Amino acid sequence: MDKLQNIRGVAFDLDGTLVDSAPGLAAAVDMALYALELPVAGEERVITWIGNGADVLMERALTWAREERATLRKTMGKPPVDEDIPAEEQVRILRKLFDRYYGEVAEEGTFLFPHVADTLGALNASGLSLGLVTNKPTPFVAPLLESLDIAKYFSVVIGGDDVQNKKPHPEPLLLVASRLGMMPEQMLFVGDSRNDIQAAKAAGCPSVGLTYGYNYGEAIALSEPDVIYDSFNDLLPALGLPHSDNQEIKND
């Protein structure tokens, strides 16, 4: 398609795009909830909360856990719990616990999606500049990329603490494009969620939406990315590079 003709660089989201981080995130969320004597959520539910950074993840987890506890107590005929700690303070405590537990389980609970490593290698070898934009707290990003052996492919990495405004705000994408030395329209952004596509549109970047990510249980097509792919390595032929499998473009 025309928007991919003059691409000089590619930037990627992390969670749900390059890596399946749900097992580690869910484990850390549940350990934090358990430490506060709140119901645990489980991976299937936590997946629907991923995408807006750790603070929002904690807010969603706490809101659900308090409602779930109230429902369970009502079912058992028990009186509601008198919340002596304000929700804002509980979120702060939960975030502190989450950070500690996630630091322990992040690497063992995160896995590359199929074709990610070889596709990043091919893109890098072609001369394209690569960047990473994630809402994940910055201290977790570099160690995770190193443990997965993909840090070497990225010239610029922007974590959630590196900007004032996280995705879907365009700020992190504009920052990456600037540091890569190109205009936003020359940088393709690849993600799995509506936050990614909204950020790309606001920044003026062409976008690819991947169908296998998290995206709050919604189809990525609803966000209207420029192109939709089922497999990560479908990026290669779209950018004029060899690809042994048949790519399937869902829309133009």
Swiss-Prot record:
Which pathway?
A: Organic acid metabolism; glycolate biosynthesis; glycolate from 2-phosphoglycolate: step 1/1
Catalyses which reaction(s): 2-phosphoglycolate + H2O = glycolate + phosphate
Amino-acid positions noted as binding Mg(2+) in the UniProt annotation, renumbered to this chain: 13, 15, 192
Task: Please provide one cellular component term from the Gene Ontology annotations of this protein.
Answer: cytosol
Where on the tree of life does the source sit, at the highest rank?
A: Bacteria
Give one GO term, molecular function aspect.
phosphoglycolate phosphatase activity
Q: What class of enzyme is it?
A: hydrolase
Residue positions of the active site = 13
User: Which GO terms fall under biological process for this protein?
Assistant: carbohydrate metabolic process; DNA repair; glycolate biosynthetic process
InterPro entries, per this entry? HAD-like_hydrolase_sf (IPR050155), HAD-like_sf (IPR036412), HAD-SF_hydro_IA (IPR006439), HAD_2 (IPR041492), HAD_sf (IPR023214), PGP-like_dom2 (IPR023198), PGPase_prok (IPR037512)
Name any cofactors this protein relies on.
Mg(2+); chloride
State the EC number(s). Answer: 3.1.3.18
Please give the CDD domains that the UniProt record associates with this protein. HAD_PGPase (cd16417)
**Keywords of this entry:** Carbohydrate metabolism, Chloride, Hydrolase, Magnesium, Metal-binding
Q: What does this protein do?
A: Specifically catalyzes the dephosphorylation of 2-phosphoglycolate. Is involved in the dissimilation of the intracellular 2-phosphoglycolate formed during the DNA repair of 3'-phosphoglycolate ends, a major class of DNA lesions induced by oxidative stress.
Family according to the record: Belongs to the HAD-like hydrolase superfamily. CbbY/CbbZ/Gph/YieH family.
PANTHER family linked to this entry: PHOSPHOGLYCOLATE PHOSPHATASE
Subunit record text = Monomer.
Output this protein's name. Answer: Phosphoglycolate phosphatase
Q: Please give the organism.
A: Salmonella choleraesuis (strain SC-B67)
